[in-house]
Amino acid sequence: MSCQVPTVPASPVVKFPLLPRGLLSYLPANLSSILPVARGAASTCEASSTTTTTMPPEPPASPPPPKKMSPPGAGAGAGSKKKQQQQADAAELARVFELFDRNGDGRITREELEDSLGKLGIPVPADELAAVIARIDANGDGCVDVEEFGELYRSIMAGGDDSKDGRAKEEEEEEDGDMREAFRVFDANGDGYITVDELGAVLASLGLKQGRTAEECRRMIGQVDRDGDGRVDFHEFLQMMRGGGFAALG
């Protein structure tokens, strides 16, 4: 029995945990050289009990190219720009779907997905791929058709803002890690505070002109010591470093 593709309502948006966000947007146009398309071979969906060789249907037709952007001031509205973006996204979706649909039958099987991801350097266990397909396979035929693939694609692209927030958070965490390493350099005994003696020792080892005397180190610490305990904790150290570091206190 060959795979059937009944018309069904669009499946709910499902996050794809296996592909990095944005992967579909930066696949090169010449990816066909990496993923050769073997047209004409029959596919077998996991939900099928038997295999029947049929003529593959025509691959999804790409939508017309977006209209040329009007020059500034020519009256191109936000609606026109949005439509052009939608057309560009649809064209990209069709191109990427065709690359994964190795035999051009309008469906992506688990084997095709596994093989294509492997060639992209993203090996994924077969059982995980089967679970992913099951989550987005709205019609239950064991394959991913272009509509189901579109839901997957849109869920990835809709995460763009989240991705930016994620990158900003990663950068902040990376900066925090760097600052903690620097703090540990000053905090010689690891008690979570930088004392006058510890500050003087590090500044002397760095050959800086600041902090050559205990009184000078005490004055420098006093400029950033918010709680008045005569020491610098990590949060005080972080604020100071963002303001130029100990050298800015000289």
From Swiss-Prot:
Residues 88-123, 124-159, 174-209, 212-247 form the EF-hand domain. Ca(2+) 2 binds at residues 137, 139, 141, 143, 148. Residues 56-69 have a biased composition (Pro residues). Ca(2+) 3 binds at residues 187, 189, 191, 193, 198. CDD domains: EFh. Keywords: Calcium, Metal-binding, Repeat. SMART domains: EFh. Residues 45-55 have a biased composition (Low complexity). Ca(2+) 4 binds at residues 225, 227, 229, 231, 236. Gene3D superfamilies: EF-hand. GO terms for molecular function: calcium ion binding. This is Probable calcium-binding protein CML22. It comes from Oryza sativa subsp. japonica.
